[in-house]
Amino acid sequence: YYLLRGIPSYEDGDFSTEKFEARYNADLANNLGNLVSRVAVLIEKLFNGSFAYSRKYVLKEVDDKVINTWKKYIESLDNFKLHLALENVFSLADFANLFVDEHKPWALGDNPEHLNEVMTNLIVILLNVAWLLKPFLPETSNRIFEVLGADKDGKSWEEKPFQVRPKILFPKIQ
């Protein structure tokens, strides 16, 4: 991951243990791992571990962000700019973390409609992040699907509730 994310294709790069640990902690532990954990724990606490996803709750802002991310991702892959493809994936994860902070789902217990909307949008983002990561981090992608209790093929996401299994994906390197 570090080499793909941190060093542009066809260019020289610099590797150090310190840079590796910093990238791992920033991208994987703090950003992605924390996001997956936050969403799973929220579903566990607010929905007793089972969440029924519904496409009707997906916001245009989120839909546009996901579509735009896929377009940039594919363009980056077409141009062999793997570091930019991963940058787009983590930009989507950043967006989701800001979405959590902005909408504060833990405080929406008295507004179930808005809570469903917020959690649906977070699920949509995480499912797309998992798919986007598949070529680069296939095990991580599978673990995200597993934590969310989502089918890896995406065929039945709206047919049955997600059964979350919260766990830490990336422990921090100290």
Over which residues does each language-model region extend?
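Catalytic adenosine-cofactor/nucleotide-binding cores of aminoacyl-tRNA synthetases and other
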Residues: 1-57, 150-170
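Conserved, charged catalytic cores of large soluble enzymes
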Residues: 10, 36-73, 97-112
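Basic, alpha-helical terminal appendages of large translation-related enzymes
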Residues: 13, 75, 80-81, 90-174
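A short, ordered amphipathic alpha-helix with a cationic face
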Residues: 6, 59-63, 117-120, 132
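Generic alpha-helical secondary structure signal
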Residues: 18, 57-71, 80-83, 113-116, ...
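Extended, non-catalytic structural segments that build the interaction scaffolds
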Residues: 14-28, 68-87
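Residues that form generic nucleotide/phosphate-binding pockets
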Residues: 2, 23, 65, 69, ...
